[in-house]
Protein backbone atom coordinates (compact mmCIF):
# COMPACT_ATOMS: atom_id res chain seq x y z
CA UNK A 1 0.00 0.00 0.00
CA UNK A 2 2.74 2.46 0.99
CA UNK A 3 4.84 1.52 -2.05
CA UNK A 4 1.90 2.05 -4.37
CA UNK A 5 1.18 5.47 -2.85
CA UNK A 6 4.84 6.45 -3.17
CA UNK A 7 4.91 5.32 -6.81
CA UNK A 8 1.70 7.22 -7.61
CA UNK A 9 3.13 10.30 -5.93
CA UNK A 10 6.37 10.07 -7.96
CA UNK A 11 4.45 9.64 -11.21
CA UNK A 12 2.20 12.56 -10.33
CA UNK A 13 5.15 14.85 -9.45
CA UNK A 14 6.86 13.90 -12.72
CA UNK A 15 3.75 14.83 -14.71
CA UNK A 16 3.47 18.11 -12.82
CA UNK A 17 7.14 18.92 -13.52
CA UNK A 18 6.64 18.22 -17.23
CA UNK A 19 3.49 20.34 -17.24
CA UNK A 20 5.28 23.20 -15.46
CA UNK A 21 8.17 23.09 -17.93
CA UNK A 22 5.76 23.17 -20.86
CA UNK A 23 3.78 26.07 -19.34
CA UNK A 24 6.97 28.11 -18.87
CA UNK A 25 7.92 27.45 -22.48
CA UNK A 26 4.44 28.45 -23.60
CA UNK A 27 4.67 31.72 -21.65
CA UNK A 28 7.89 32.58 -23.49
CA UNK A 29 6.21 31.78 -26.82
CA UNK A 30 3.33 34.07 -25.90
CA UNK A 31 5.82 36.86 -25.13
CA UNK A 32 7.30 36.48 -28.63
CA UNK A 33 3.81 36.66 -30.15
CA UNK A 34 2.96 39.80 -28.19
CA UNK A 35 6.26 41.47 -29.10
CA UNK A 36 5.75 40.73 -32.80
CA UNK A 37 2.15 41.93 -32.72
CA UNK A 38 2.93 45.18 -30.86
CA UNK A 39 6.31 45.91 -32.44
CA UNK A 40 8.07 45.97 -29.07
CA UNK A 41 11.54 44.62 -28.19
CA UNK A 42 11.74 41.16 -26.67
CA UNK A 43 12.44 40.74 -22.93
CA UNK A 44 16.07 39.87 -22.27
CA UNK A 45 15.43 36.30 -21.08
CA UNK A 46 13.52 35.57 -24.30
CA UNK A 47 15.89 37.45 -26.60
CA UNK A 48 18.84 35.39 -25.32
CA UNK A 49 17.04 32.07 -25.92
CA UNK A 50 18.10 31.33 -29.51
CA UNK A 51 16.69 27.78 -29.48
CA UNK A 52 13.23 29.07 -28.59
CA UNK A 53 13.31 31.61 -31.43
CA UNK A 54 14.53 28.96 -33.88
CA UNK A 55 11.66 26.64 -32.91
CA UNK A 56 9.06 29.41 -32.92
CA UNK A 57 8.13 28.83 -36.58
CA UNK A 58 6.89 25.34 -35.65
CA UNK A 59 4.93 26.56 -32.64
CA UNK A 60 1.38 25.39 -32.09
CA UNK A 61 -0.83 27.02 -29.49
CA UNK A 62 -1.02 24.77 -26.46
CA UNK A 63 -4.53 23.88 -25.38
CA UNK A 64 -5.40 24.27 -21.76
CA UNK A 65 -6.03 20.94 -20.07
CA UNK A 66 -7.95 20.13 -16.93
CA UNK A 67 -5.66 20.14 -13.93
CA UNK A 68 -4.59 16.58 -13.23
CA UNK A 69 -5.30 16.95 -9.50
CA UNK A 70 -9.02 17.37 -10.12
CA UNK A 71 -9.52 15.63 -13.48
CA UNK A 72 -10.52 12.21 -12.11
CA UNK A 73 -13.74 13.32 -10.36
CA UNK A 74 -14.26 16.87 -11.65
CA UNK A 75 -17.93 17.44 -12.44
CA UNK A 76 -18.75 13.75 -11.92
CA UNK A 77 -19.24 13.19 -8.19
CA UNK A 78 -19.90 15.48 -5.26
CA UNK A 79 -16.86 16.42 -3.17
CA UNK A 80 -16.54 14.93 0.30
CA UNK A 81 -15.23 17.69 2.58
CA UNK A 82 -14.22 17.45 6.25
CA UNK A 83 -14.02 20.63 8.35
CA UNK A 84 -11.99 20.57 11.57
CA UNK A 85 -10.00 22.89 13.82
CA UNK A 86 -6.70 23.09 15.62
CA UNK A 87 -6.48 21.29 18.96
CA UNK A 88 -8.42 22.58 21.99
CA UNK A 89 -10.51 25.10 20.03
CA UNK A 90 -12.20 28.01 21.75
CA UNK A 91 -15.98 28.38 21.73
CA UNK A 92 -15.75 31.02 19.00
CA UNK A 93 -13.58 28.86 16.74
CA UNK A 94 -15.94 25.90 17.23
CA UNK A 95 -18.86 28.11 16.25
CA UNK A 96 -16.97 29.37 13.21
CA UNK A 97 -16.22 25.76 12.20
CA UNK A 98 -19.96 24.97 12.32
CA UNK A 99 -20.67 27.93 10.04
CA UNK A 100 -17.88 27.03 7.61
CA UNK A 101 -19.31 23.50 7.51
CA UNK A 102 -22.65 24.97 6.43
CA UNK A 103 -20.92 26.87 3.60
CA UNK A 104 -20.03 23.60 1.86
CA UNK A 105 -23.19 21.54 1.18
CA UNK A 106 -21.51 18.10 1.25
CA UNK A 107 -19.16 18.72 4.18
CA UNK A 108 -18.93 17.10 7.62
CA UNK A 109 -17.55 18.73 10.77
CA UNK A 110 -15.06 16.64 12.75
CA UNK A 111 -14.02 17.29 16.34
CA UNK A 112 -10.20 17.30 16.30
CA UNK A 113 -9.70 15.62 19.66
CA UNK A 114 -6.20 14.15 20.04
CA UNK A 115 -5.68 13.47 16.34
CA UNK A 116 -2.20 14.33 15.11
CA UNK A 117 -2.07 15.66 11.56
CA UNK A 118 -0.61 12.51 9.97
CA UNK A 119 -3.30 10.27 11.47
CA UNK A 120 -5.99 12.75 10.48
CA UNK A 121 -4.79 12.80 6.85
CA UNK A 122 -4.54 8.98 6.77
CA UNK A 123 -8.11 8.68 8.07
CA UNK A 124 -9.34 11.15 5.42
CA UNK A 125 -7.65 9.26 2.60
CA UNK A 126 -8.99 5.89 3.75
CA UNK A 127 -12.54 7.26 3.95
CA UNK A 128 -12.43 8.72 0.43
CA UNK A 129 -12.39 12.35 1.56
CA UNK A 130 -11.61 14.78 -1.26
CA UNK A 131 -10.75 17.89 0.79
CA UNK A 132 -9.78 18.73 4.36
CA UNK A 133 -10.37 22.20 5.82
CA UNK A 134 -8.45 23.09 8.99
CA UNK A 135 -9.22 26.29 10.93
CA UNK A 136 -6.73 27.98 13.27
CA UNK A 137 -7.04 30.74 15.86
CA UNK A 138 -5.10 33.09 18.10
CA UNK A 139 -6.64 33.97 21.47
CA UNK A 140 -10.14 33.06 20.32
CA UNK A 141 -9.93 34.91 16.99
CA UNK A 142 -9.95 32.78 13.79
CA UNK A 143 -6.71 33.62 11.97
CA UNK A 144 -6.05 30.97 9.30
CA UNK A 145 -7.78 28.49 7.00
CA UNK A 146 -6.02 25.64 5.21
CA UNK A 147 -7.52 23.59 2.36
CA UNK A 148 -5.81 20.32 1.44
CA UNK A 149 -6.95 18.25 -1.55
CA UNK A 150 -6.60 14.47 -1.58
CA UNK A 151 -4.93 12.22 -2.51
CA UNK A 152 -1.94 14.22 -3.82
CA UNK A 153 -2.61 17.90 -3.06
CA UNK A 154 -2.48 20.85 -3.57
CA UNK A 155 -2.65 22.54 -0.17
CA UNK A 156 -3.64 26.22 -0.01
CA UNK A 157 -3.06 28.25 3.16
CA UNK A 158 -5.00 31.47 3.77
CA UNK A 159 -4.88 34.02 6.55
CA UNK A 160 -8.28 35.19 7.84
CA UNK A 161 -9.27 38.80 8.50
CA UNK A 162 -12.40 40.62 9.74
CA UNK A 163 -14.26 37.43 10.66
CA UNK A 164 -17.93 38.08 11.49
CA UNK A 165 -20.05 35.13 12.62
CA UNK A 166 -23.70 34.69 11.69
CA UNK A 167 -25.07 35.65 15.10
CA UNK A 168 -23.13 38.95 14.86
CA UNK A 169 -25.01 39.94 11.69
CA UNK A 170 -28.33 41.70 12.25
CA UNK A 171 -31.36 39.89 10.81
CA UNK A 172 -29.20 37.13 9.37
CA UNK A 173 -32.16 34.78 8.90
CA UNK A 174 -32.07 31.02 8.56
CA UNK A 175 -29.16 29.21 6.93
CA UNK A 176 -30.13 27.62 3.62
CA UNK A 177 -28.41 24.31 2.87
CA UNK A 178 -29.29 24.01 -0.82
CA UNK A 179 -26.48 23.92 -3.37
CA UNK A 180 -25.39 27.54 -3.98
CA UNK A 181 -24.62 29.62 -7.02
CA UNK A 182 -20.94 30.62 -7.03
CA UNK A 183 -19.54 34.01 -8.06
CA UNK A 184 -15.78 34.47 -8.54
CA UNK A 185 -14.85 38.07 -9.26
CA UNK A 186 -11.56 39.64 -10.39
CA UNK A 187 -9.30 36.57 -10.44
CA UNK A 188 -7.25 37.56 -13.49
CA UNK A 189 -3.85 35.85 -13.17
CA UNK A 190 -2.88 32.17 -13.57
CA UNK A 191 -2.43 32.00 -9.78
CA UNK A 192 -5.89 33.52 -9.35
CA UNK A 193 -7.41 30.89 -11.65
CA UNK A 194 -5.57 28.23 -9.66
CA UNK A 195 -7.24 29.49 -6.46
CA UNK A 196 -10.63 29.54 -8.21
CA UNK A 197 -10.15 25.89 -9.21
CA UNK A 198 -9.34 24.93 -5.61
CA UNK A 199 -12.35 26.77 -4.19
CA UNK A 200 -14.96 25.75 -6.76
CA UNK A 201 -14.13 22.06 -6.39
CA UNK A 202 -15.24 22.31 -2.75
CA UNK A 203 -18.83 22.63 -3.99
CA UNK A 204 -21.06 20.09 -5.78
CA UNK A 205 -21.17 20.38 -9.58
CA UNK A 206 -24.31 20.79 -11.63
CA UNK A 207 -26.95 23.36 -12.52
CA UNK A 208 -28.66 25.15 -9.63
CA UNK A 209 -31.38 27.11 -11.44
CA UNK A 210 -33.87 27.32 -8.58
CA UNK A 211 -31.39 27.81 -5.74
CA UNK A 212 -31.93 31.08 -3.80
CA UNK A 213 -28.44 30.87 -2.29
CA UNK A 214 -25.38 32.76 -3.59
CA UNK A 215 -21.78 32.60 -2.33
CA UNK A 216 -19.40 35.27 -3.59
CA UNK A 217 -15.60 35.20 -3.67
CA UNK A 218 -14.50 38.71 -4.66
CA UNK A 219 -10.81 39.49 -5.04
CA UNK A 220 -9.80 43.02 -4.03
CA UNK A 221 -6.08 43.62 -3.72
CA UNK A 222 -5.40 39.89 -3.08
CA UNK A 223 -7.92 39.86 -0.21
CA UNK A 224 -10.73 37.44 -1.09
CA UNK A 225 -14.00 38.67 0.41
CA UNK A 226 -16.36 35.79 1.17
CA UNK A 227 -20.06 36.66 1.40
CA UNK A 228 -23.17 34.48 1.50
CA UNK A 229 -26.60 35.80 0.50
CA UNK A 230 -30.07 34.50 -0.17
CA UNK A 231 -32.39 36.25 -2.59
CA UNK A 232 -36.14 36.39 -3.07
CA UNK A 233 -37.84 37.52 -6.27
CA UNK A 234 -40.59 40.05 -5.63
CA UNK A 235 -42.94 42.02 -7.83
CA UNK A 236 -40.56 45.00 -7.75
CA UNK A 237 -37.36 43.05 -8.35
CA UNK A 238 -35.03 40.99 -6.19
CA UNK A 239 -34.46 41.32 -2.45
CA UNK A 240 -31.05 40.28 -1.15
CA UNK A 241 -30.25 39.31 2.45
CA UNK A 242 -26.84 38.45 3.89
CA UNK A 243 -26.82 35.31 6.03
CA UNK A 244 -23.10 35.08 6.88
CA UNK A 245 -20.51 34.23 7.90
CA UNK A 246 -18.46 37.13 6.54
CA UNK A 247 -14.67 37.18 6.29
CA UNK A 248 -11.66 37.96 4.11
CA UNK A 249 -8.99 35.45 3.07
CA UNK A 250 -5.47 36.16 1.86
CA UNK A 251 -3.41 33.43 0.22
CA UNK A 252 0.09 33.15 1.66
CA UNK A 253 1.26 29.69 0.53
CA UNK A 254 0.40 27.06 -2.05
CA UNK A 255 2.16 23.68 -1.93
CA UNK A 256 1.93 20.64 -4.19
CA UNK A 257 1.58 18.03 -1.44
CA UNK A 258 -0.96 17.20 1.22
CA UNK A 259 -1.15 18.84 4.62
CA UNK A 260 1.10 16.47 6.57
CA UNK A 261 3.87 16.51 3.92
CA UNK A 262 6.42 19.03 5.19
CA UNK A 263 8.79 18.32 2.27
CA UNK A 264 6.25 19.13 -0.46
CA UNK A 265 7.32 21.49 -3.24
CA UNK A 266 6.15 25.07 -2.76
CA UNK A 267 4.25 26.23 -5.84
CA UNK A 268 3.85 29.81 -4.62
CA UNK A 269 4.64 31.69 -1.42
CA UNK A 270 4.02 35.27 -0.33
CA UNK A 271 7.35 36.96 0.37
CA UNK A 272 7.02 40.14 2.37
CA UNK A 273 10.71 41.01 2.18
CA UNK A 274 10.46 41.78 -1.55
CA UNK A 275 10.24 45.54 -2.04
CA UNK A 276 7.33 45.37 -4.46
CA UNK A 277 5.35 42.78 -2.46
CA UNK A 278 2.90 45.32 -1.04
CA UNK A 279 2.38 47.04 -4.40
CA UNK A 280 1.76 43.98 -6.54
CA UNK A 281 -1.47 42.01 -6.95
CA UNK A 282 -0.85 38.29 -7.38
CA UNK A 283 -4.42 37.08 -7.91
From Swiss-Prot:
A biological process from GO: rRNA processing
Location of this chain's protein in the cell: Nucleus, Nucleolus
UniProt keyword Nucleus, yes or no: yes
Residue stretches making up the Brix domain: 79-260
Keywords linked to the UniProt accession: Nucleus, Ribonucleoprotein, Ribosome biogenesis, rRNA processing
Major subcellular site: nucleus
Keyword Metal-binding listed: no
GO terms, molecular function: RNA folding chaperone; rRNA primary transcript binding; single-stranded telomeric DNA binding; snoRNA binding
Pfam families assigned: Brix
Membrane-traversing stretches: none
Gene Ontology CC: Mpp10 complex; nucleolus; small-subunit processome
Described purpose of this protein according to its UniProt entry: Component of the U3 small nucleolar ribonucleoprotein. Required for the early cleavages at sites A0, A1 and A2 during 18S ribosomal pre-RNA processing.
Subunit structure: Component of a heterotrimeric complex containing IMP3, IMP4 and MPP10.
UniProt-recorded name of the protein: U3 small nucleolar ribonucleoprotein protein IMP4
